[in-house]
């Protein structure tokens, strides 16, 4: 994915599956990385709390311990985390161990305290940023695929995300629809985030979506709230948080003439707290706005809040849906402009209009070498599976595939003859 990646194909050809797998993979990395430092601190504080309870009043009775160990658990945590030098931290913990070993304690209490200190040391030495990646992948796969991820007829499926340096990658194996193994190698930073847009129609359902739970969070005993895949709630939360402040990204939106294309812009009404479409100082409920306008509104708000950027992937599943062919051309031009600005994008499509528009504007903006095309189609040896092959240099294969349904109904005269017979 060196710019814009386009996966074309007919319905039920596996296009969306590819997009969702990529979303799960990147989102798992992002979520785990964001939580790793917070989790490490939380676990450390819990371990320090146990240690302090175990030592009890000895902390205050022993002059040495009173001098070495801060009064509060939080202060102790900050002290340990601030010791970036491994040797200094180890010497500090060893000093505490030596003091404890000389105090009059029962063998069991002394042993438990030593175990606590050992756990604290292990937590501090944990340098893996992705230690909980397996659980995160499992939750996201359950959310997106509802326990039906493994290839039909196969016991296991494997996924690998390779990075540009050729050394960093995320690999995981799913066995019987559960994450069996997961590992991250290399130190390259993957991506800051990913946003998956399935439909712009969700704009007028924001409040309902935000009140719903994501799949992994759902309590099976609670039926009052809806259950939604991660990518839908993720997009809704991002759109809802979009601000109206002028940022560099907002200028990008202005340069792309988004407001001119739709003759207005989307913004949150501070009085009602709801999203509105503004045109000529008149506000309209999102539900009353054309679907095509909503699509450009999604891009506008994602740009304005920096939700998509040169290191935040945008995935859009069949953006041409509910859109007039002329607006498909406008949207294709915007996507190419984003590509030229350095934004990584993955698009799936079954529209020859949209595909040709991407091809045309890629040439017009001189970014053809940064656009890769793939065709998803049923596997010849297994109708239950699909294959995805690169067709950047053989795009006619795609147009033939997408045009085939229309070709079947082009000859009206032939249809009349059949009726006459």
How does the language model describe each region?
Residues 1-36, 274-420:
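Switch/communication elements of ASCE P-loop NTPase nucleotide-binding domains
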Residues 28-311, 386-421:
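Phosphate-coordinating catalytic segments in nucleotide- and nucleic-acid-processing enzymes
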